[in-house]
Amino acid sequence: MTTPSTKLNSGYDMPLVGFGLWKVNNETCADQIYHAIKAGYRLFDGACDYGNEVEAGKGVARAIQEGIVKREDLFIVSKLWNSFHDGDRVEPICRKQLADWGLDYFDLFIVHFPIALKYVDPAVRYPPGWLSENNKLEFSNASIQETWTAMESLVDKKLARSIGVSNFSAQLLMDLLRYARIRPATLQIEHHPYLTQERLVTYAQKEGIAVTAYSSFGPLSFVELDLKDAHETPKLFDHDVIKGIAQKHGKTPAQVLLRWATQRNIAVIPKSNDPTRLAQNLDVTGWDLETSEIEVISSLNRNLRFNDPLAPSRLDPIPDD
């Protein structure tokens, strides 16, 4: 099973459904990627910060070696971490990440957060996380413009076919578009019925910037991180509105949540290690929700953001070995 694509402003096609690598276990990552490719997934969304790019690359290499896919059939995404925003750090870390994946280019390389942190040498700690080599939260003076200029050079050097941003506000996008020589192809944001960000989505799409949703299942992604809000918020899978719509269409709650996004041309990047769920998550484009159903799902919005980049737990000192 394959899924439709959306045309990026860079001219490339990006699948509307992909496989996200956040929190994918290193021990199982290669096998998960391999089996996802066999199931029909073509977009894989990784990042330096996830710490599993070497293993992900092994899964890709196995699938290519066995003739299941060719490199050009895949759409591989990775992200620039906060510690590498200085202009002279962008290309070296991109090349390292490409080497980890075993690739010559990324289909899409994204600025992970609009937050520039002090450089951490990969030889000292990789992924670097949020703290400096001094075990503190320390910022770099790199501006987004400096970082973006370096990102554009990745396209010039054919290290990335498209470049994009993540966790940007509309205001930051407006600023970026004033000076960008190469416009961001995508905006990746937390997007689920408890955090719809409708005005941001509308603005990005109006500017020709494709939107990708992460954490499509809302609090579920964050319960294991022991976030208070995630524990206290009703699970979307159990919500009467979602369950009722799922029953009506003969789909699972997960499929309804994903279709709520893809029907509005928003890409999604769920993950699963279960073959049945892998197939179900791909089956979110060939059927439609009614307009009234999309509206009632959107009405669940609470402006509730779970991915807080400055949450206290992320800023705890790293314990000594």
Curated annotation (Swiss-Prot):
Where substrate binds, per the record, is at 112
Name of the protein: Probable NAD(P)H-dependent D-xylose reductase xyl1
> Its gene?
xyl1
What EC identifiers does the entry list? 1.1.1.307
InterPro entries tied to this protein: AKR (IPR020471), AKR2D (IPR044487), Aldo/ket_reductase_CS (IPR018170), NADP_OxRdtase_dom (IPR023210), NADP_OxRdtase_dom_sf (IPR036812)
To which species is this protein native? Neosartorya fischeri (strain ATCC 1020 / DSM 3700 / CBS 544.65 / FGSC A1164 / JCM 1740 / NRRL 181 / WB 181) (Aspergillus fischerianus)
Sites where the protein binds NAD(+): 166-167, 215-224, 271-281
**What are the site positions for Lowers pKa of active site Tyr?**
79
* Family recorded in the similarity comment: Belongs to the aldo/keto reductase family.
Taxonomy of origin reads:
Eukaryota, Fungi, Dikarya, Ascomycota, Pezizomycotina
Provide a GO biological process annotation.
D-xylose catabolic process
One function term, GO molecular function aspect: D-xylose reductase (NADPH) activity
- The answer to keyword Secreted applying to this record is no
Q: Which UniProt keywords apply?
A: Carbohydrate metabolism, NAD, NADP, Oxidoreductase, Xylose metabolism
Reactions this protein catalyses:
xylitol + NAD(+) = D-xylose + NADH + H(+); xylitol + NADP(+) = D-xylose + NADPH + H(+)
Keyword Nucleotide-binding carried by entry: no
Among the Pfam families in the record, one is: Aldo_ket_red
